[in-house]
Amino acid sequence: MKPTRLTECGNWVLDRFPVTKFWNDHMAHYYAPKNFNFWYFFGSLALLVLVNQIITGILLTMNYKPDAKLAFDSIEYIMRDVPWGWLVRYMHSTGASAFFIVIYLHMFRGIMYGSFKHPRELIWIFGMLLFVALMAEAFMGYLLPWGQMSYWGAQVIISLFSAIPVIGDDLSLWIRGDYVIADATLNRFFAFHVIAVPLVLVMLVFMHLVALHEVGSNNPDGIEIKESKDPWGHPVDGIPFHPYYTVKDIVGVGVFLLFFATVIFYMPEAGGYFLEHANFIPADPMKTPEHIAPVWYFTPFYSILRAIPDKFAGVIGMGGSIVVLFLLPWLDRCPVKSIRYRGGIFKKALLLFVISFIALGYLGTQPVTPIATILARLFTAIYFGFFLLMPIYTRWEKTKPVPRSLTKIHSLEEQFHTLEEQLPALLAEITAVKPLSAEIGHPAFKSSFFSRRPNTEGMINVIGRLAKKAKGSLD
C-alpha cells in the first residue's frame, strides 16, 4: 500500500529530526524501577510547576512595568483591570511557593533513599545547582512587586555582600547599580528574573534529566536494576516509564492541582506566608517595617544568618548551609543507599535534621528574641552536625543486608490462592472449638454439635505477628 502524503511528510521530518528515537530512549523504552512510591511524584511535579511559572510569568510581563514609580501600580492594574489578571498573578505567586515545596520534598527523598550516592553524584550536583538558580530566581522576582517587604527584604540581603572583606562594598554597589535600591536595581533584577536565570534553569533541568537517564533512576530499596537483565536485555526489576509511570504521574498531578487550586481560590496569601501583608503597601525608603523577614522558603537560611552574632561569620554560615549540601555524596561513607536498610543512627540523625530545618524555618519568620536566638543556635548546630559528623556515624553504623533484587510482587490470582491456603489455619488459631452433645428425641438419634468461640491467646499471637510484619515493612 502506497503511503499517504501525510505519512511521507512525517517520515521526511523523522529522517531529519528523530522525535521517535528521543521518545523511545527517554520514555517508552526507558526502564524505571518497578517499586517507585509516593516520594517519586515530586520530580515530575517540579517540571509541572516550572512550566506554570514560565507561562504565567510571560503573561504577567505583558502588563508589568519595571519602573520604580510604576511597578507597584502595574501590579494593582493587573489585579484589578486586566481580565483574569488576578488569577494569573495568584498562579504565579502560589507557584513560587509550590515550587519550593516540591523541591524540598524531592531533595528529602534523595537524602532518604541515597539518590546522591555512586553513580549518581553528578545528578545531585546538577540538582543542587538547580536549587541555587531557583533561589536566585525567587529572590530577584521577590523585588519586582515593589512593596514594603520586597524593598526592605532585598535591602537586607544585598547589604550582606558588604560583609565580604576587600570587595564587599564594591560588590554590593555593583549588584544594586546604585547607592540604594532604586530604579537601576529593579531593572537589572527584572532582566535576570525574566530572561537570564530562566535560561539557566531550563539548561540545568535538561542536564539533570540527561544525567539521570544515563545512569538510571534510584529506587526505595537502593538496588541497581541494571545489574540483572532478562534475555532481551531489559532490567528484570524495571518497567517502561511510559505508560506505567506517566499514568501514575497523571494521578499525582491531579491531586496536586486540587490542592494548588484550593490555595489559589481560597487562600492565595496563605496567612501572609505566600504573599506578605506588608507587600500590599508601596515601597517607602524612608520607613522601615517593624519586622523584616524573607519569604518562608528562605527563612531556614535566614535564621542561620541571624543566629551567628558576627555579620561576616553569619554570611559564611548561611552560605555554608547551602554549600555543604553539594558535598553530601562524599560525606556519606555508608555502603548502603536506602534508609530501609540503614542503621538506627542515620534514621535518628535524619529525623533531627528535618526537625531542625523546620524549626529554623519557623524561627526565621519570628522577631528576634533571646529565647529565639538560643533555639536558632541550637538548631543551627544540629543542622551542620548532621553533615559534618556524617563521615563518622555513617562509617560505623550497623546496616541490614540489601536484597539482590526487588521484592517479588505477586499477581492478584496468586494472592487469592495464598489467602485460601492460609485462611483455615488462621481461623483455627483465633477460635476455640468445643464439642457439645445433645439428644434429639430417641437416644439412637444422639448427635454431636460444636461451639466455636474466640480464642484470646490465638488473637494476641496473630496481632503480634501482624505488628512485627508492619514494623518490618516500615523499616
Residue ranges and their predicted role:
Residues 1-98, 102-423, 427, 431, ...:
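Membrane-embedded and interfacial regions of multi-pass energy-transducing membrane proteins
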